[in-house]
């Protein structure tokens, strides 16, 4: 190696080396960039760094390590290969890239040599370790230790390092120089009689800024040799040098044959532009939190043992090693040599430089190939470490495995180093051994990835319109309402009626008056007369029986007049008005009365309001028009019934008379008017789920004869759905196939005979054969290559059915999606609903010959349970566009998909069997396997602890803190949402939840309210379940984190339940626990409290909810409070008119609730976690006792007579005075009653603890008694018990009272 004479001028950085004798301190530039790695060698041979020529090699074999100089020749070094011997081996054809670390080390040796020549004695170099002289950890004898001062000297040795003695001898002329005539320069060191080799290596590849600029002096081919022993001679050979000072990722190779058991390697993604930033980051910034020594700013030594396992995960096994520069051995710490690195120093006094020549040595190519083969073998033998189950690590692993090259190859100028990941693994390994069990899982962060995954999958599985789906998560768009004015734009005759369609969707009632006439001329005349009449009546505001506001909206009226608006062709009533009516008609009429009224208007269309517009036509003797108007009115009645069935089918699930009346009306009157419309309405009953709800509620215990009266054997759709929910479905094997959701032939026949009271087996086989031919069920031989009907193997999985039936070229298809669930098939892998064209929820409405759809709608998913006693809300309606009859025909044209929909099935999961399945005949055999097809739901993958996989069915192996907070939030949301879906509008009528018989009348709403209160007490129970304050702090922090996640899930109801639990008096009084919560989490908690605060009538919450987001679980207490105040208004006005303004306000609340029921959370149910979340909770009184046992109030308390004073002090840790103890121990003495009473009075009147450190001042206790059996009983003062007040307050809010 060439060493310039003026190496003194090389920049030094913070070289604070303690030294003996006359060693001077180096310059300090406040940069800790000096790293010298020294490894020990037991051999007596000299390990040297040499520069050799081809002529001869003179080796200094003296026992004393020395630096010899041979100044014999001055040669040009252009044609010589510089070999660097490291640890006794030669790395040929390698280019050194050295930064300030090596230059400072060389400068140190040069100064040591100069001082040695002048003083003729040995120089000792003191090396401090961790600011002290101490030994390396015994368990990590190969782990480098870091010095807190500069230069950092990393020493690998088992002994205690106190000093490093450098004995420097000059054998020849006494100068340090470069001998280019063939002699070697030996740099040897003695350390406690051991021969050490200098191993200059940096912890990471050096970058551009580490290079020292070179001053290339051309034609400078002579070495400066003189008789001065203190000079350093060198030759600057840069005439034809191709050295590159800007090479990135330079690395120093270490011989693989020596010390191959190194336990650490390089790699990882720490983004640093240069080594100076890296050293500052590693040494100065306290990034890696120290465990053993708080003042250390470097990773602890034990962390190095983890680096190997951590780094290897970032090196794909398929990495291709193409060159020495791209070679990366994960089992090595030393860096590779890459390209040319010149070390030079440009000063005002000299242009000398320290160069490393970049000449190719072809003789070393074979050695390089051998090294590459060894590295490839190591990569192939490398075993990956088992990774964590967290989503973030999974994503990190996927992104790493997807790349074909290592990070060093992809980014040679930017080496990454993931210290955060390493440190988490290091903490995990230590915590499993030393930390308590509740600190095992460290769940920290905002969990944006998991939350986004949950909401994204919920939206992808849902059936909301695209406009509503865009209003999810962070897409804060304004609430959109359907405002389709297609008919108004296409029909200029209705321009005067556009004012009645503000913020409403077009209804069939609007379109029926404009598009169904024989000729254009006649239509114009009829519409003009109707419009004129309507305008006069609305302008005069003098309609008998109706009252309008300034916006031409009905605010009051008689019952018959309001119903007449839906059938009056002279009025244009939007869908919103119809929805408001259907939501609130229970206030002034029964469902039977409404159906009777609609039947009367269907059979006698020319009545009431219609007579006013018909009288003009009778004068002109236009009988054709009268018949057409009668048809329009009947179609309007059908439209009302259609909306009633699709969106309010819950009304037919509780009243057998109503259901039977509806079926009779459809089979009789509607079928006689239009057979196709009758079939459509009957299908709508099945699709809306009201039939299944009716069976679940009313026919669960009924006889089979009654069931057959309701469902005929021709109604294959209903039979298929009922079978899928009642018949036990299992996973069966047939040959090499595994068929899910399957049943045998004999099971189906037996079920059908028992349920429908069939006389013979042939009748059951005939019905099942029709279902098989209609693709409602499938034979196992036609399951195809892909059959996994159920979406998951979870014990209970909610699925929905979504299919579509094709429509004709002149027909507009309306997709009606519905879903139902039952609890009978939990063993088959889910709550299921069959999917086929006839049993699917998709159907086409009867359409007209002119290509327009007569009645279309889209109902969105709703889920029911056969075990529930009441139904739930059906789905939100996306209203129709137009309706009418063309060519004067009274019978609309219905596509074949309605009358014969059984041949248009479409499976969403399995490959649909071919049409050849129609040739199958159902066989009554136990070996014949059939199955249902269900939709595959894209559920987010559960995040469960590792112990869950070892014992998934055991609830004792995992605790609350072992579960990921995101998964806890998911399961809490799933539990509450299942209860939320079961609510129906009838549960909210007349504040039924506040009545004494609420449990019998509205059990679903009461269960939902009780669940919210249970969550509050469960939160308090989990916090108070341990007397260890660290455990309580961990649980409290976890609940704050879960609350933040629920806020992002838009689960406001569960969020408020957790906040109320944290606000209970038994929790608020835990002063020491609250003091351990950091300010960041307290601020986050306060923000959540402000959002859900009832201040200004929940103004903050209402502002957040002003923009609808889906999915969402709203805070039910706000709706109950609004309904409570609305109900204070009268149902009828003084003149006997219905207060329809009140009905509009009620319907607004109910429509909003219904809207959030249409888009559900698609989550997997995990029973083990649900059992933990539904664990036993303590009562309010028990919670308060437990709270005082954990943290005693700082006041005097009474003690039972049979308890010794010492036991009391030990048990309660309460400061009591001797006088009080003596008085309390004399309770059996009647003479001391007065004294005891006085003491109790004094205790009650004593001041409460200061609230400065606690969020809410703790409530004082009148007395606490410890009985003989070590049980604690407390006498609480009702006036001072804040927890009891909190309970009353929470119930007050949930019931919506003032």
UniProtKB/Swiss-Prot annotation:
Keywords recorded for this protein, A-Z: Coiled coil, Guanine-nucleotide releasing factor
Which classification does the entry list for the species? Answer: Eukaryota, Amoebozoa, Evosea, Eumycetozoa, Dictyostelia
- Asked whether the UniProt record includes Coiled coil among its keywords, one would answer yes
Report which superkingdom the organism of origin falls in: Eukaryota
Q: List the disulfide bonds.
A: none
Q: Which organism is it from?
A: Dictyostelium discoideum
Its protein name is Ras guanine nucleotide exchange factor Q
Ras-GEF domain location is: 964-1193
> Residue ranges of region Disordered?
1-26, 46-88, 211-271, 314-384, 459-533, 781-864, 884-920, 1214-1267
Domain N-terminal Ras-GEF, which positions? Answer: 550-689
Kindly state one GO CC term assigned in the UniProt record: cytosol
> Which intervals hold domain DEP?
723-801
SMART domains for this protein: DEP, RasGEF, RasGEFN
Per the UniProt record, one Pfam family is: RasGEF_N
């Amino acid at each position: 190696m060439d060493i310039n004479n003026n190496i003194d001028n090389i920049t030094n950085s913070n070289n604070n080396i303690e030294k003996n004798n006359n060693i001077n301190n180096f310059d300090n530039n406040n940069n800790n960039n000096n790293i010298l790695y020294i490894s020990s060698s037991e051999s007596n041979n000299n390990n040297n760094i040499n520069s050799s020529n081809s002529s001869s090699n003179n080796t200094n074999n003296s026992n004393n390590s020395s630096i010899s100089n041979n100044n014999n020749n001055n040669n040009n070094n252009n044609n010589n290969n510089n070999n660097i011997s490291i640890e006794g081996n030669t790395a040929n054809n390698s280019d050194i890239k050295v930064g300030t670390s090596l230059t400072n080390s060389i400068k140190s040796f040069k100064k040591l040599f100069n001082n040695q020549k002048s003083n003729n004695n040995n120089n000792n170099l003191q090396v401090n370790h961790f600011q002290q002289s101490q030994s390396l950890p015994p368990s990590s004898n190969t782990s480098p230790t870091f010095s807190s001062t500069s230069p950092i000297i990393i020493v690998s040795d088992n002994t205690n390092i106190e000093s490093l003695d450098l004995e420097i001898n000059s054998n020849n002329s006494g100068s340090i120089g470069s001998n280019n005539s063939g002699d070697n320069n030996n740099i040897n060191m003695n350390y406690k009689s051991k021969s050490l080799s200098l191993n200059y290596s940096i912890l990471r590849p050096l970058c551009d800024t580490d290079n020292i600029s070179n001053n290339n002096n051309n034609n400078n081919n002579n070495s400066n040799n003189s008789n001065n022993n203190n000079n350093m001679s060198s030759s600057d050979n840069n005439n034809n040098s191709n050295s590159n000072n800007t090479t990135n990722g330079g690395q120093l190779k270490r011989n693989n044959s020596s010390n191959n058991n190194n336990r650490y390697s390089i790699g990882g993604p720490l983004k640093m532009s240069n080594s100076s930033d890296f050293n500052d980051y590693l040494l100065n910034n306290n990034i890696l939190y120290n465990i053993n020594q708080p003042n250390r700013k470097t990773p602890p030594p034990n962390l190095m043992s983890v680096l190997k396992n951590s780094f290897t995960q970032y090196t794909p096994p398929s990495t291709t090693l193409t060159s020495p520069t791209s070679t990366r051995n994960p089992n090595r710490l030393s860096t590779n040599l890459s390209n040319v690195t010149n070390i030079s120093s440009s000063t005002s006094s000299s242009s000398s430089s320290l160069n490393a020549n970049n000449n190719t040595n072809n003789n070393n190519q074979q050695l390089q190939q051998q090294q590459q083969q060894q590295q490839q073998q190591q990569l192939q033998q490398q075993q990956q470490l088992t990774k964590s189950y967290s989503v973030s690590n999974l994503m990190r692993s996927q992104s790493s495995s997807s790349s074909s090259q290592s990070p060093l190859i992809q980014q040679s100028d930017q080496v990454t180093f993931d210290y955060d990941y390493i440190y988490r693994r290091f903490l995990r390994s230590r915590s499993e051994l030393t930390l308590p069990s509740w600190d095992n899982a460290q769940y920290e962060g905002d969990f944006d990835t998991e939350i986004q995954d949950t909401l994204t999958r919920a939206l992808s599985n849902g059936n909301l319109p695209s406009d509503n789906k865009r209003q999810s998560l962070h897409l804060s768009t304004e609430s959109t309402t359907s405002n389709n004015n297609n008919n108004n734009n296409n029909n200029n005759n209705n321009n005067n009626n556009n004012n009645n369609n503000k913020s409403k969707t077009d209804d069939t009632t609007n379109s029926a008056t404009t598009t169904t006439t024989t000729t254009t001329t006649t239509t114009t005349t009829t519409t003009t007369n109707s419009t004129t009449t309507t305008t006069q009546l609305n302008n005069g505001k003098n309609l008998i029986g109706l009252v309008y506001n300034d916006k031409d909206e009905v605010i009051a009226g008689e019952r018959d007049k309001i119903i007449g608006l839906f059938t009056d062709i002279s009025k244009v009533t939007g869908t919103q008005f119809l929805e408001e009516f259907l939501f609130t008609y229970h206030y002034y009429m029964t469902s039977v009365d409404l159906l009777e009224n609609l039947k009367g208007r269907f059979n006698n269309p020319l009545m009431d309001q219609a007579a006013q517009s018909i009288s003009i036509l009778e004068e002109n003797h236009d009988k054709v028009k009268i018949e057409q108007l009668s048809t329009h009115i009947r179609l309007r009645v059908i439209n009302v019934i259609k909306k009633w069935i699709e969106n309010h089918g819950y009304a037919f699930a509780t009243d057998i008379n109503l259901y039977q009346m509806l079926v009779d009306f459809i089979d009789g009157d509607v079928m006689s008017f239009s057979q196709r419309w009758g079939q459509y309405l009957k299908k709508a009953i099945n699709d809306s789920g009201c039939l299944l709800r009716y069976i679940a509620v009313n026919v669960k215990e009924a006889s089979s004869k009654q069931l057959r009266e309701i469902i005929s054997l021709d109604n294959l759709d209903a039979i298929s759905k009922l079978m899928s929910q009642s018949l036990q479905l299992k996973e069966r094997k047939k040959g090499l196939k595994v068929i899910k959701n399957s049943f045998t032939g004999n099971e189906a026949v037996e079920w059908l005979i028992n349920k429908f009271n069939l006389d013979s087996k042939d009748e059951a086989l005939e019905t099942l054969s029709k279902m098989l031919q209609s693709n409602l069920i499938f034979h196992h031989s036609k399951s195809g290559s892909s059959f996994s009907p159920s979406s998951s193997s979870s014990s209970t999985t909610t699925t929905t059915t979504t299919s579509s039936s094709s429509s004709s070229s002149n027909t507009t298809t309306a997709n009606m999606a519905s879903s139902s669930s039952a609890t009978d098939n939990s063993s088959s892998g889910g709550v299921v609903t069959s999917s086929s064209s006839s049993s699917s929820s998709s159907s086409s409405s009867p359409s007209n010959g002119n290509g327009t759809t007569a009645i279309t709608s889209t109902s969105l998913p709703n889920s029911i349970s056969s075990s529930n006693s009441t139904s739930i809300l059906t789905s939100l309606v996306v209203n129709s566009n137009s309706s009418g009859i063309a060519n004067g025909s009274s019978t609309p044209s219905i596509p074949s998909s309605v009358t014969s929909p059984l041949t248009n099935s479409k499976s969403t999961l399995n490959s649909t069997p071919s049409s050849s399945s129609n040739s199958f005949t159902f066989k009554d055999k136990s070996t014949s396997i059939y199955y249902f097809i269900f939709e595959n739901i894209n559920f987010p993958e559960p995040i469960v602890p590792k112990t869950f996989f070892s014992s998934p069915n055991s609830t004792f192996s995992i605790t609350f803190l072992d579960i990921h907070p995101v998964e806890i939030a998911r399961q809490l949301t799933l539990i509450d949402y299942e209860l939320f879906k079961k609510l129906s509008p009838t549960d909210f009528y007349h504040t039924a939840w506040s009545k004494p018989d609420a449990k019998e009348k509205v059990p679903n709403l009461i269960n939902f309210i009780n669940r919210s209160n249970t969550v509050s007490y469960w939160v308090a129970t989990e916090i108070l379940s341990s007397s260890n304050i660290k455990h309580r702090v961990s649980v409290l922090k976890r609940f704050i984190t879960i609350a933040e996640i629920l806020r992002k899930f838009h689960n406001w109801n569960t969020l408020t339940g957790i906040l109320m639990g944290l606000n209970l008096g038994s929790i608020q009084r835990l002063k020491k626990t609250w003091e351990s919560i950091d300010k960041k989490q307290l601020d986050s908690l306060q923000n959540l409290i402000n959002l859900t605060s009832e201040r200004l009538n929940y103004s903050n919450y209402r502002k957040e909810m002003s923009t609808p987001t889906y999915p969402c679980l709203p805070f039910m207490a706000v709706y109950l409070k609004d309904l409570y105040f609305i109900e204070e208004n009268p149902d009828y006005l003084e003149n006997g008119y219905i207060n329809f303004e009140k009905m509009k306000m009620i319907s607004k609340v109910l429509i909003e609730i219904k809207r959030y029921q249409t888009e559900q959370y698609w989550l997997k149910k995990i029973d083990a976690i649900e059992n933990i979340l539904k664990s036993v909770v303590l009562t309010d009184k028990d919670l308060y006792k437990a709270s005082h046992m954990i943290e005693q109030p700082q006041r005097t308390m009474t003690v039972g007579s049979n308890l010794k004073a010492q036991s009391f002090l030990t048990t309660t840790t309460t400061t009591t005075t001797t006088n009080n103890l003596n008085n309390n121990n004399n309770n059996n003495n009647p003479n001391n009653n007065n004294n005891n009473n006085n003491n109790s009075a004094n205790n009650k009147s004593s001041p409460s603890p200061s609230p400065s450190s606690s969020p809410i001042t703790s409530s004082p206790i009148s007395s606490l008694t410890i009985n003989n059996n070590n049980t604690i009983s407390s006498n609480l003062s009702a006036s001072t018990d804040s927890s009891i007040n909190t309970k009353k307050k929470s119930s007050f809010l949930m019931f919506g009272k003032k």
